[in-house]
A protein has these predicted regions:
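C-terminal and inter-domain tail/linker signature
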Residues: 1-128
Length: 128
């Protein structure tokens, strides 16, 4: 597949799963079972997630995405019970596309911002 076709697969994945909250076609888009589970678990924990694709770049089989997102913690997430607290954060992700499906992934969220916002960790102010 071309870089543009790979970008289209990743854009569709992000738009359908994280923006439209519809994972009914996830098996068409993702061959990696871990990513399918993580994506569906994330949407269940944060069902009102709002996500904006800020940048989408592709070279060969690799597609890079930069997003901004906000959501309310309404379901269990990584063992943390719902807090009802809202967070805003950014993420960058790299996806490998093989045979028209996402086969591997590397995602970097601003986990500290998210965990502080939902109350999973205490905010620590820098010492002076």
């Amino acid at each position: 597949m071309s870089s543009e076709e790979n970008k289209a697969v990743v854009r569709r994945f992000v738009e359908e799963v994280f923006i439209q909250h519809d994972s009914s076609n996830i098996e068409e888009l993702v061959s990696n079972e871990s990513l399918r589970q993580i994506a569906q678990g994330t949407v269940q924990a944060f069902p009102d997630m709002e996500m904006t694709v800020e940048q989408l770049i592709s070279e060969g089989d690799v597609v890079a995405v930069r997003v901004s997102a906000a959501a309310t913690h309404k379901g269990e997430f990584r063992g943390i019970a719902a807090t009802g607290r809202r967070w805003e954060a950014t993420a960058s992700a790299w996806y490998e596309v093989r045979d028209g499906k996402i086969s591997d992934f590397w995602v970097n969220w601003d986990w500290l911002a998210i965990m502080e916002a939902i109350g999973a960790v205490e905010r620590v102010e820098p010492s002076r």
